[in-house]
């Protein structure tokens, strides 16, 4: 195995009193050298973390057990039109810029959105046979287990413009993709590797959809419209929008509680985490965590919600009962985060610094 991981333990920690809450994060490793890590997700079996490096145009697979690299997968580059989010105008770029991801087959398949490709890709971690008559993206894969490098492919599925968050339904029938610049959501047949419908959200209101959450029965998709300030509800049986619920001015990331009643929302510009009751359609709780609140995640026992403030460089832990911040830590430019299924690790990406921080979640009984 190649062991060339560069890591550091240089990080500032700000502890709030533990008191009755009893949660604490222990920093255990830092990975450096990522090209603008946008997102991190943990495989359903908890075995590995998948890191999406937007500007690096690659993704990393890292063991959650050994904290060693498993694979680095580099896309072959082709020119494409990108988007300058500060100047609000098109720019010259490349198609293969990974944004977000999800899984099927208990982590065997990784579903990845490509920012400038108007497409998503599916990578088979088991490197199974190529499926004929489909589109593909090319990858150079370095395997850190075998020490070998090889040319591989990932199935390419057209969507609409600027796909971002992608979620596979629990029954693995569909992948639901939010298309930022098309005001639409693509519904992809997971087995056929084909987009079967593009659903417009917001009518003529020019919504910007980003966050996606799926009900546990795979019957509904909730879409956070970052421009629009609403949650669009899609019926996954009829494949149509059945509701459009005003929630907060700038909803970015959403997570659904296990009882399907509470939707946790990050309000990006206003820097808040919000608890929203889907039955009464009312905001029940909110807490300010710092400007530009990005990704959020629930602990498996739903006692805590983890969140980051990108501009203020804060990682916070919020008690879901009191909705108080019970722990905070300084992290430079945090963007993505994910919790392992056993509730023992938290992974956080630092976008501008090109780092991924790994924490042990301590002081809290595991689910």
Show which residues each predicted segment covers.
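Predominantly soluble domains enriched in secretory-pathway, periplasmic, or organellar proteins
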Residues: 13-367
């Amino acid at each position: 195995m190649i062991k060339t991981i560069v890591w550091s333990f240089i990080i500032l920690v700000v502890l709030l009193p533990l008191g009755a809450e009893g949660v604490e994060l222990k920093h255990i490793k830092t990975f450096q050298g990522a090209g603008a890590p946008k997102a991190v997700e943990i495989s359903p079996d908890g075995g590995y973390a998948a890191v999406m490096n937007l500007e690096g145009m690659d993704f990393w697979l890292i063991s959650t057990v050994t904290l060693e690299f498993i694979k680095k997968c580099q896309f072959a580059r082709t020119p494409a039109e990108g988007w300058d989010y500060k100047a609000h105008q098109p720019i010259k770029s490349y198609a293969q810029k990974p944004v977000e991801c999800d899984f099927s087959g208990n982590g065997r398949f990784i579903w990845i959105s490509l920012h400038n490709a108007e497409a998503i890709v599916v990578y088979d971690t088991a490197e199974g046979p190529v499926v004929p008559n489909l589109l593909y993206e090319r990858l150079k894969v370095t395997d850190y287990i075998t020490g070998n490098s090889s040319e591989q492919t990932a199935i390419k599925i057209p969507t609409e413009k600027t796909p971002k968050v992608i979620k596979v339904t629990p029954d693995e029938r569909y992948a639901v993709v939010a298309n930022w610049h098309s005001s639409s959501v693509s519904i992809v047949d997971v087995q056929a590797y084909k987009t079967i419908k593009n659903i417009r959200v917001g009518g003529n209101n020019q919504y910007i959809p980003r966050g996606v959450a799926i009900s546990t029965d795979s019957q509904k998709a909730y879409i956070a419209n970052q421009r629009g300030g609403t949650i669009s509800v899609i019926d996954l049986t009829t494949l149509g929008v059945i509701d459009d619920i005003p929630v907060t001015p700038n909803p970015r990331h959403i997570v659904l509680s296990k009882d399907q009643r509470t939707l946790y929302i990050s309000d990006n510009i206003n820097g808040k985490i919000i608890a929203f009751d889907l039955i009464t359609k009312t905001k029940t709780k909110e807490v300010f965590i710092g400007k530009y609140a990005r990704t959020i995640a629930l602990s498996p026992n739903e006692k805590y919600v983890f969140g980051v403030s990108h501009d203020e460089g804060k990682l916070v832990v919020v008690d879901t009962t009191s909705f108080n911040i019970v722990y905070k830590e300084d992290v430079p430019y945090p963007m993505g985060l994910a919790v392992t299924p056993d509730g023992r690790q938290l992974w956080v990406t630092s976008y501008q610094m090109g780092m991924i921080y790994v924490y042990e979640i301590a002081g809290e009984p595991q689910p």
